[in-house]
Amino acid sequence: MTTLDWDETRAAEVAGRVDAPRALPLRLAVPAAVLAGLAMLLAFPPYGVWPLAPVGVALLGAAVHRRRLRAGAGLGFLTGVALFAPMLEWTNLHTGYLPWVLLSLLQAGYLALLGVATAWVSPLVDRRRWAWPVVTGLLWVAQEALRDRTPFGGFPWGRLAFSQDTSPLLRLAWLGGAPLVTFAVALTGGLLLAAGWRRWPGRDRRGWVPVALLVASALALTGGALLVPTGAAGTGRTVTVAVVQGNVPRLGLDFNAQRQAVLNNHVDATLELAAGVDAGTRPRPDLVVWPENSSDIDPLRNASAGERISQAADAIGAPILVGAVLLGPDRGRVRNAGILWRPGTGADLSQLYTKRHPVPFAEYVPLRTIARMVSKQVDLVRNDFVPGERPGVVRSGPAVLGDVICFEVAYDGLVRDTVDGGAQLLVVQTNNATFDVAEARQQLAMVRLRAVEHGRGALMASTVGVSGFVTPDGRVSGATGFNTRAVVLRQMALADGRTPATRVGVWPELALAGLAVAVLVAAGGLRRAHRREVDAGR
């Protein structure tokens, strides 16, 4: 209701405060909103200029402060388009422009809601300028909590936390996971915003004191994160793990048109590794990990495919975690699975993980009849992938693995469930053949956060790259190139302890989002009080 808006021209007179901040002129607010999105974009891989994330937060806050709600929505939407359209450009490489445009606009819609919320709380932060940073952090966490879950299970790509893979703030994931990192980034942005707003009380040199304190607080928050420990209690044991990146005949959606060639690539790369082991030039792995879609031929039903995988497992003398597409359980349905293949005995059906969060409109089509009215391309997804029901805890023998497949690494609960189930090592099986190197590096940034969050060594195995290993403090080693065949080995320590983030689970996010709701309610009370003051003065 526009009657409850914090009027931009009369509020200072009603409150009797000539120093109250006013909205930026629209000619400045619009470019500020666009620059906010671009600044945040540059914070993410492949650019990785992480300090720009809080700068983007500050610019968006400045653009929408004291705006009417519709203007806040529009400016937030501009920020969202500037951020998500280029970030998600890899979605149009092989599927056309429509999915990219629709997904980008949908994600931008959540920043439009954030713009509304930020404009709504303007009277609160005008009265309590020192609350501005905290309020900013709370609203960002609440926005991401909503975006991560809706619609159809949400799409967490582009969370502020995932821009901090090389930042000291990454260590905060050890305490409270991705939501706490997002809160810290947005809080830092709020500190910059409060420091940079143009009208502070005080006309002399003392007017710079609050500015200096806020900037110092932003720097202290970032630097202080280095004091947060990483890792978790270990078992004292290590395992040697080989990641096989077999590559594909060609990039794009039709990579699986040569399914046998993709399988052969991974078998042959493993046989080459086995030959190196026998020759004494390479260490023998305790475990081998193949990526998602390394066998798009169901090896449980196709004897030839099963024999080829067994050939590789027997040659290397170690279990292989195979990314496979399995037919069933019903006609027209399939499963995206990680299945353990043991030397000598073959498939271990007791150690099979089925992807719990298939990607909507890519691995299954919700509301297919309606979706077909928008685009006939939905029928490219001929078979719907069936979600699994159990966490990806795979007991390989040498180690207990926490397996997630592709985009699942972006979802807090799916990864945490594997650690709660006893995972000693995190594994991400992924197929980036339909995307590009930017998407792969964005995904690797998520793996780094998960490693710190749960105090576990982690690895990412991709069909085409980037594959690599991550230590519990977030450092990457053995990263492969893109669109190449590679086999990388590392000795990895096993951990069975639990970090504070693992223990508290979803509660920090719930608490921060709940406080955001309370802030919105409090701001509503101030708006009603303002309206009564205006009415009384007439």
Language-model-derived ranges and their functions:
Residues 2-227, 436-437, 447-450, 463-464, ...:
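Membrane-embedded alpha-helical bundles of multi-pass enzymes
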Residues 230-508:
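Soluble catalytic domains of enzymes that build or remodel membrane lipids, polysaccharides, and related
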